[in-house]
Structure formats: structure tokens, C-alpha cells
């Protein structure tokens, strides 16, 4: 029998589970894993918090694992204010969208890089839009940002609407919720200096995410609205 080996992980969420235990959702290169952490009030429990790089040994073959060993694998990412809210938003997105035990190593790497950028005080909106887009793309929900659903290049002066899971459709009559071609092309190039590109990207990602999140709102979004 092979001995379980540790793998890099971050805690996405933790809650009390039975006596002195916690039920923890982890993000790993092998996907989102849920595991029971025994003696959660001890040393291991102090590590089981978000934004701490960990090495975790998981035991068990079922969907609910057990934490065999958990150690710090680096310095915790320290965030406050809107950067902290942003990190909580990323965690909630991953819990809601990432299937259990579905490997997405690129998502793990981008998550770790985004946490570091948030801690360094980088502008929040470009980081969040990039994470949302790359998460959708990695899960198979992405679409072209430089061409419409017919494969035609986007026109700078064109107007488009999102057909979720299909792509961008050009329209010729004004209606609510449209996107300008210039804004979309700027998003494709991550050129946030173009006027309106960031606000349009936020609208576009909300539309793209909504169908996959279902009707239940994201709790972390409410944090940004509080005074």
C-alpha cells in the first residue's frame, strides 16, 4: 500500500464538525477537496484558515477525506479591507463553481498568484476580472473575446450582447446591457486604460457567472457594499 503524500493546498472554508473537529474545504492542484480535520482546536486548527499556503496529506478514498497531516508551506498572505474581501470572494467563487475532486492545477496556480498580488496592493478590479475569466475558461465556460459567435472579428464600433456559453453576438438595435466592441477588444488585450473597459468587464463577468452560480447570491459581494 502506497503511503499518502502531501500536496499544496489552501483552505477555502472551515466549519465546526462534531466534537473538536472541523469540516474543511481545500483548494489543491487536484481540485476542491473536503476533509475532516481532527483536533481542530489544536495546532493544526490554527493553520486551517484562509490564505495560508499549506502542505496537506489527505487520507481516504471517498469524497469526504481525512486530514492525516497538515503543515505550513510558507508565509500567510496578509490582507485587509477590500483586498481581504476580494480574497473571500475568490474563495466563495471556487466553492460554488469548482466541482469536487476535479483537477485544475492552473486554477490553483492563478489563485496563489492572485492572493500575492492582492497582498501587494495591486489594483483590485483587473485582478478580479482576470481571475473570473480564467476560472470560467478553465472550467470550459469561456468564449472568444475578439470574435463573435459566427467567428467574425469584433468591430471597434460594433455593439454586442453575451449569449451565455455561446459567445458574443453582434446586434444592431440599441437595448440594455450591450457591450461596445472597443471595450471588448480592450478586455481581450487586458488593456484597462481604455475608457469603460473595466466597468464593462465587471458587467460581462457577472453575466457570464450568473448562470453557473444559480439564483443564490454571493455573500462576499455584500461586503463591498457595506459602509
From Swiss-Prot:
InterPro entries, A to Z: ARFGAP/RecO, DNA_rep/recomb_RecO_N, NA-bd_OB-fold, RecO, RecO_C
Pfam family, one: RecO_C
Protein's GO biological process: DNA recombination; double-strand break repair
Xref: Gene3D superfamilies: Nucleic acid-binding proteins, Recombination protein O, C-terminal domain
Bridged cysteine pairs (disulfide): none
GO cellular component, one term: bacterial nucleoid
Highest taxon in the source lineage: Bacteria
Keywords recorded for this protein, A-Z: DNA damage, DNA recombination, DNA repair
Family of the protein in this entry: Belongs to the RecO family.
HAMAP family found in the cross-reference section: RecO (MF_00201)
NCBIfam families: reco
Annotated function: Involved in DNA repair and RecF pathway recombination.
Protein name: DNA repair protein RecO
Organism: Pseudomonas syringae pv. tomato (strain ATCC BAA-871 / DC3000)
